[in-house]
């Protein structure tokens, strides 16, 4: 079994002080990586000898992959993010489905997400970088978010059928939406490349 490498989200610690001091504290605690930080923090993280596990590859959580009118923008943003990921040896980029909107069913939204991910997948495969679509809850924190169930996310991944397109499985969010976490993870582990962990309730 591959050892677990613990990473911490930048937003959890960012307010604790100056970036260099915060990064040092994270390293002293024993974390291997910092993730979800803004790119201007990347050099500080790497200079401290830490990894960057993942960062957000494109703009806008609510206005995401599930709208075709966003695809050109997101494609360009992901291409720029691939360059950053290569520069700083980041193995994964985070992607976001976007929120539900009138006139598009969840099935149609999945197909639209698969279209743009299929377009980007060959680049991800060539560069050896994962595209991880995050599962978020739509009941508490992100009302309307479309990728709010493991089944839906896996359906998108199966349509794309790329070894570099997978899910970011967020344990906090999926406990709110589904529960039965261990069984769900075991049954779908081939479609999961990254995990986020937090307790529920209370996070």
Model-derived features: where do they sit?
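A short, flexible beta-alpha/helix-coil linker loop
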Residues: 59-62, 99-102, 137-139, 200-203
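Bacterial c-di-GMP phosphodiesterase catalytic domain signature
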Residues: 179-186, 190
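Short, flexible active-site loop motifs that bind/organize anionic cofactors or intermediates
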Residues: 12, 64, 103, 143, ...
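N-terminal pre-domain/capping segments
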Residues: 1-87, 158, 162, 178, ...
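Active-site acidic/histidine proton-transfer and metal-coordination neighborhood
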Residues: 40, 67-166, 176
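Histidine-bearing beta->alpha loop at or near hydrolase active sites
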Residues: 172-173, 202
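Conserved beta-strand positions
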Residues: 31, 36, 95, 133, ...
């Amino acid at each position: 079994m591959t050892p677990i490498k613990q990473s911490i989200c930048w937003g959890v610690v960012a307010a604790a002080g100056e970036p260099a001091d915060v990064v040092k504290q994270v390293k002293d605690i024993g974390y291997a990586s910092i993730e979800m930080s803004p790119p201007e923090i990347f050099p500080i993280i790497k200079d401290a000898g830490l990894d960057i596990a993942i960062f957000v590859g494109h703009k806008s959580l609510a206005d995401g992959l599930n709208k075709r009118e966003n695809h050109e923008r997101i494609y360009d943003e992901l291409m720029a993010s691939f360059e950053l990921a290569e520069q700083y040896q980041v193995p994964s980029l985070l992607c976001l489905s976007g929120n539900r909107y009138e006139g598009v069913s969840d099935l149609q939204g999945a197909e639209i997400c698969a279209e743009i991910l299929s377009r980007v997948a060959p680049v991800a495969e060539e560069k050896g970088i994962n595209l991880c679509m995050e599962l978020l809850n739509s009941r508490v924190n992100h009302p309307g978010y479309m990728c709010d169930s493991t089944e839906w996310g896996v359906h998108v991944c199966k349509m794309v059928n790329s070894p570099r397109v997978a899910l970011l499985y967020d344990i906090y969010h999926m406990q709110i939406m589904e529960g039965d976490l261990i069984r769900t993870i075991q049954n779908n582990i081939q479609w999961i490349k990254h995990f986020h962990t937090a307790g529920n309730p209370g996070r």
